[in-house]
Amino acid sequence: MNPETFIEKYAAALATQDWQQVDPLVHPDACVTFSSGAVHVGQTAVRQAFERNFSLIQDERYAIENVHWVMQGEDTAVYLFTFHWSGIINGKPTSGAGTGSSVLINSENGWQLLVEHLGPKTG
């Protein structure tokens, strides 16, 4: 797997709303910041945050677009992106979008998410 393939697998795994699909793609030391400003450090905290979102948002659709590679090396890759999501929350259609930045690390388990920072949509 290369960093580009990682993004495809990550988006597909998130779309399943099943942590078991996402887990192999998240580094044990991962740190994820949601657009709300909530910071989740470590794979356990990240898992709990994602599972909370999975249970809150039904039939979620998630897309990563406009990927811009800041750098790609043999062991590290950094990219910027936009994201869009939609789903049902409390019986009502809901959606959102924003920007993000991610750091990937090529570990003994292949490419994994080390840092993800999601922010509000700009411009």
What are these regions (language model features)?
Residues 1-21, 31-123:
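A beta-strand edge to alpha-helix "cap/lid" segment located at domain peripheries
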